[in-house]
């Protein structure tokens, strides 16, 4: 029996080599995912949050009923509307990549050419828009545009520009191409720009987002998100916290103004 296996040793060696080669190719092509974490003190009136101490007297009189608790605030933090605002603010509905061999590299914050396409126009897209940009050191670019990608209404057209900035107008709106001052063009190259509906992008970010309280006795919540680009994940969480706090302060000011008007009316 041993002899039968020995005479077939080349097959075993070949199998091991093939498996190792497949594993190496997979590791080279796969994109690592980063887990980004942060903590936030969220608004919670029941635990002495932004409004609890200021309006507790009115609450006792039944004039103010702050029903929001930490669970409500977590729902606000991971709401599609707030996440979509973050997507629009950071322009995350526009994605930049480049292909080298079999691998696609993410160019978030590192694209030599930036595309501006308004969120309002992006919200009218029924399917992703794909732009393939061939650029030269001289500043010349050739843009191939595919609209309605993957749908029955898929259309393709191209246009060349001799310099940047350049404006491309079409039935799907206007796209402005700008040079990235932080990433100068030093050689000819090619990149792909994908523009999607902001709500579709917001849904994917919401799916990758996890928010929860650190304990039952605290108003501190942890926020974590998995993203293939560490800087993009950090920017997303920072902007999410910033916009949540901004909205919370606006709510606080509105309640304070309405309460002041009510007190003035009662006094009068």
Predicted regions and their residues:
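Hydrophobic and amphipathic membrane-targeting/association helices
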Residues: 1-268
